[in-house]
Amino acid sequence: MTSKSLNAWVIHKQWSGDTSARLKLFTREMGLINCLCKGGRTPKKQSLLQAFIPLWVSIEERYDQYYTRNIESTSSRLDLEGHSLFSGLYINELLYYTLSPDFPDPDLFDAYLFTLNGIALAREREVIEALLRRFEWALLKACGYTFSFLHEARTGELIVPDSYYQFVAGEGFILGGDKKIPGEHLLAIAADNLSESAYLKSAKFIMRQAIDHLLGGREIKARSLYGPA
């Protein structure tokens, strides 16, 4: 049996039988993993097996199945409520539906941690929106789906501030089109400038289409609660 220690967050939980829980954990060391937690219904473990609690988890692999051995919290549960809570549920759903199992990406894990801590502290919706847009971009990169905010997709020419572009999912930005985005906005987003509401609105529009393309038709339920993307 191989034992591993992981930094983890619970992304999804499903009860299994009378005593156990099936978990989907997002970990720094192994990415997204599925594991069985025996005794998961005990009061102590139920208090730990919740979203937004940073965990240290020891697992072992037997017959191509991961089992938890020990679970401890490394800090208290993040205080998420209202828009922050719905946003946390949103990014958890994104991870659940887009990541392949056992594919570690420490940069994405760090982005997840940064985003959760940021939305827990945020007091303005615009701040939360900007954090979500940056996380969505980190997720797109982790999944190998990126596009240039600096170059026109079909010609390779530089984006011009005074020109208008249309976003084509799976391709990038093309000059003209029906749904026009100012080149100025694209260059601002490329520079990570989401301080103006117009830039943030364009980033939201672009990321919504890009994420939907990545999801391949899967529905994100948290959008109906908050509509963060």
Swiss-Prot record:
The keyword DNA damage applies. Gene3D superfamilies: Nucleic acid-binding proteins (2.40.50.140), Recombination protein O, C-terminal domain (1.20.1440.120). Keywords: DNA damage, DNA recombination, DNA repair. The keyword DNA repair applies. GO terms for cellular component: bacterial nucleoid. One of its GO terms (biological process) is DNA recombination. PANTHER family: DNA REPAIR PROTEIN RECO (PTHR33991:SF1). Involved in DNA repair and RecF pathway recombination. HAMAP family: RecO (MF_00201). Belongs to the RecO family. This is DNA repair protein RecO. It comes from Legionella pneumophila (strain Corby).
